[in-house]
UniProtKB/Swiss-Prot annotation:
Native organism: Arabidopsis thaliana (Mouse-ear cress)
Residues carrying covalently attached carbohydrate according to the record: N61, N494
EC code(s) of this entry: 3.2.1.21
Lineage: Eukaryota, Viridiplantae, Streptophyta, Embryophyta, Tracheophyta
Protein name: Beta-glucosidase 22
Distribution of this protein across tissues and organs: Expressed exclusively in roots.
Length: 524
């Protein structure tokens, strides 16, 4: 048995003890159970899995689908898309009925999907044509989910701006996107709002703005040439990310205004993606405040406006004229413009005060006056990181982040829209190696326990949890070798799906207790 394949086996005994111990909490909404399972959570708690259109659908030349931002980015920069083949992806477009059966096999209650803008409006605007075949595909998908007792959660925008809008005016760099996004959101709410009641306007606005327009790692790959790896790029780091986010937030507010007119009894939010941070040096008076400062820049950047109507004060103070300003009417639309806080959590790191920022080379990370450190002052890593893990594993940070949101934002409803573990596998690795994902199983155990503690001990109002992802898929600039799925996809042999150990665990976890669909309305 190779340690490289199973680097966390040494922790198996400890983790088994932790997750199997009795959860004894004096709280009627948190039942006492002999081991951690669905039964350990409040009645009506929703468990599911998640994907995104560009990452799984494929079929880029079907339904009159127009080119999207990532299509062109990968075509122009193949080295940054690591084996990208969007026409195949994992072919969810043709195999969704098969994959819905995988969801049923897991005993899940819900499924988070996204609607590809360019599959509905191939050229970005209704007046330029609507693909009725694209519209029908999402109707068929949603109907199949409902037929199988699975609740659809739909993301309106998961990083797939129609390329025509990108070419016409720069996409989210222009305030023109606000009007076009409102039109698109209006259309999908009208079309699907009768049977879909749970919506997310934007997925991970921090990643979209920072990675796409500040460091250039993701589409459209814009950044200033003074940053490493950006020597041949166009862009303006330290400026464009804030402009993109400003337009995105105003687009969100406009979409929510339409949503509340069109979708009765529904809920809508944004899926945020902060890490958690621990101070690099607890004895350094400069390091401790870095945690709240970097979270204001990472989470508060988009959560403060949709809660309070404006950006965090620290961002205004440090950025000055580089941070756009909302009008009074925009603030009014943004305030309380979400019904829940969507949260994508994966990992944590250490935050170190940046003593000497260079004002001539602005960037988002430097602007927060925080350097991210993999180890603290004592040279200790945060959590654990198996040899094949994409990111450090730190479940304590998950609980800390949930409590932070409760305390700072007046205990809002929170839904975990993504939580998952990435394995960096090689092309030569076999299906047997890929499905023996014990590290992912342990990751899920530890994070489900941390979430249970946040709910039952810290009294955080978490109401749902989605594993990323149902299937191995295209992980943006990391391509296909970075696998997050509960089901292994054999990219060499007809994209065949195989159940992983983590899927078996999740199925067993969800097999104990009562599914929300089995409860009467007065019990929810």
């Amino acid at each position: 048995m190779a340690l490289q394949k199973f680097p966390l086996l040494g922790l198996l005994f400890l983790i088994t003890i932790v997750v199997s111990s009795t959860i004894a909490v004096d709280d009627p909404v948190c039942p006492t159970t002999s081991k951690l399972s669905r039964a350990s959570f409040p009645n009506g708690f929703v468990f599911g899995t998640a994907t995104a259109a560009f990452q799984v659908e494929g079929a880029i030349n079907e339904t009159c689908r127009g080119p999207a931002l990532w299509d062109i980015f990968c075509k122009r920069n193949p080295e940054r898309c690591s084996g990208h083949n969007a026409d195949v992806a994992v072919d969810f477009f043709h195999r969704y009925k098969e994959d819905i059966q995988l969801m049923k096999n897991l005993n899940t209650d819900a499924f988070r999907l996204s609607i590809a803008w360019s599959r509905i409006f191939p050229h970005g605007r209704k007046e330029k044509g609507v693909s009725q075949a694209g519209v029908k595909f999402y109707h068929d998908l949603i109907d199949e989910l409902l037929k199988n007792g699975i609740i659809p959660f739909v993301t309106v925008f998961h990083w797939d701006t129609p390329q025509d809008l990108e070419d016409e005016y720069g996409g989210f760099l222009s305030e023109n996107i606000v009007k076009d996004f409102r039109e698109y959101a209006d259309y999908v709410f009208t079309e699907y709002g009768g049977k879909v009641k749970n919506w997310i306007t934007f997925n991970e606005p921090w990643v979209f703005a920072h990675a796409g327009y500040d460091v250039g790692k993701k589409a459209p790959g814009r950044c200033s040439r003074y940053l490493k790896g950006c020597e041949d790029r166009d862009g303006r780091s330290g400026y464009e990310a804030y402009l993109v986010s400003h337009n995105l937030l105003n687009a969100h507010a406009e979409a929510v205004e339409v949503f509340r007119q069109k979708v009765k009894g529904g809920k809508i939010g944004i899926a945020h993606s902060p890490a958690w941070f621990e101070p690099h040096d607890l004895k350094d008076s400069n390091d401790v405040p870095t945690v709240s400062r970097v979270l204001d820049f990472m989470l508060g950047w988009h959560l403060d406006p949709t809660t309070f109507g404006d950006y965090p004060q620290i961002m205004k103070d440090l950025l000055g004229h580089r941070l756009p300003k909302f009008t009074s009417s925009q603030k009014a639309k943004l305030k309380d413009s979400t019904d829940f806080v969507g949260l994508n959590y994966y990992t944590s790191t250490f935050s170190n005060h940046n003593e000497k920022p260079d004002p001539s080379t602005p960037s988002w990370k430097q602007d927060s006056l925080v350097a991210w450190e993999p180890k603290n002052v004592d040279h200790s890593a945060i959590g654990s990181q198996p040899l094949t893990a994409a990111l450090p594993v730190y479940a304590k940070g998950f609980r800390s982040l949930l409590k932070y949101i409760k305390d700072k934002y007046a205990n809002p409803e929170i839904m975990i829209m993504e939580n998952g573990y990435g394995d960096k596998l090689k092309d030569k690795d076999s299906v047997e190696v890929g499905t023996a994902d014990y590290n992912r199983k342990y990751y899920l155990q530890r994070h489900l326990l941390a979430m249970n503690e946040a709910i039952c001990i810290d009294k955080v109002r978490v109401t749902g949890y989605f594993v990323w992802s149902l299937l191995d898929n295209f992980e943006w600039q990391d391509g296909y070798n970075n696998r997050f799925g509960l089901y292994y996809v054999d990219f060499k042999n007809n994209l065949t799906r195989y159940e992983k150990e983590s899927a078996k665990y999740y199925k067993d976890f969800l097999g104990q207790g009562v599914r929300p669909s089995a409860l009467k309305k007065d019990e929810l």
